[in-house]
């Protein structure tokens, strides 16, 4: 006779990457005064992620930062936000603990009679899924060897906001800041008693005007 027991466990699931194109045309910029587009920086993040049976509904925001020269040769910077929604299909169930990582794979700006900002998003949705595993716990009239196994179980996750500031001496007087782009790269993480620690590196690019030069 064999004895079985059902254990509650968790498993990590990553859906196939989904692509979403976001276009935005602001109406408050005078294109007749735009002489040259210098650069466009884009970042995006998911704000809401809701798991349903067979898919995840994600919503987020794209931030466009545009630097350009006006007809007088003066550099200027503008900042726009565009909201988006996307459906990502996968092996999801309602109630799964899901989250979405957003990567900008491509960006473009078209400046003709109107200004059109475009970003191509890659959405990677992950989830912690609850599962039941049936395991053999005992057997009669058999030679039995036992081995301890560890069953992964999801407990909790937490998001914290960590302020960061730094100062660099550029050797001159900054007339105006046209834009700032920052990227955070995780380097290391470790579990501790009652929490966790993470080591990160931040790369920041600032575009500014100094003595009339960008």
Language-model region placement:
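Viral structural modules
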Residues: 1-214
């Amino acid at each position: 006779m064999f004895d079985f027991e059902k254990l509650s466990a968790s498993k990590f699931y990553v859906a196939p990457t989904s692509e979403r194109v976001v276009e935005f045309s602001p109406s408050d910029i005078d294109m007749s005064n735009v002489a040259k587009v210098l650069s466009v920086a884009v970042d995006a993040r998911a704000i809401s992620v809701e798991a349903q049976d067979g898919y995840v509904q994600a919503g987020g925001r794209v931030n466009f930062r545009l630097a350009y020269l006006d007809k007088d040769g003066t550099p200027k910077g503008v900042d726009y936000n565009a909201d988006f929604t996307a459906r990502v299909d996968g092996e999801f169930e309602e109630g799964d603990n899901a989250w979405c990582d957003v990567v900008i794979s491509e960006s473009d700006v078209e400046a003709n009679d109107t200004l059109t900002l475009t970003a191509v998003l890659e959405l990677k949705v992950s989830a912690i899924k609850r599962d039941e595993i049936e395991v053999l716990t005992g057997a009669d009239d058999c030679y039995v060897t036992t081995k301890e196994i560890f069953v992964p179980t999801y407990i909790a996750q937490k998001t914290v906001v960590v302020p960061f500031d730094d100062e660099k001496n550029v050797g001159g007087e900054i007339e105006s800041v046209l834009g700032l782009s920052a990227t955070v790269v995780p380097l290391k993480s470790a579990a501790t008693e009652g929490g966790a620690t993470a080591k990160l590196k931040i790369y920041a690019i600032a575009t500014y005007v100094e003595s009339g030069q960008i």
